[in-house]
Amino acid sequence: MAKTFNQMVAAAMAEVPVISPAKAHRRMQEDPRTLVIDPRDAADIPATGIIPEAMNISYGALTYKADNELPPEWREPELEDRSRPIITACESGELGALSGKLLKDMGFSNVSILEGGTQAWKDAGYPTK
């Protein structure tokens, strides 16, 4: 049966841990290896800005940049360690949820979704750039 975008987001959020901005901030402070990925297209970043420590890898590019079986020139070196803590965050959370699920399906074992995305991060008083 075909799924809608909202159904896929709900399924992703049911399968991948969702964390609050406060918990995400704390995790980033406690473990500097934590990688924050913003899966929006670069043109969409100015809407809310980006978490300063975040790496912008669009959802489309993430599908191959996280695949360690592809040639090295296609991959993102920051994604070699499948146990590295990763937080996915888009503007409001939906694309972050799909990206978190994608990474989990690709074998990443320590992935979380930022609840409410970058907008919730900003609303909680944390900086963006």
Each predicted region: which residue ranges?
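Rhodanese-like catalytic fold shared by cysteine-dependent sulfurtransferases
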Residues: 1-34, 39-85, 92-129
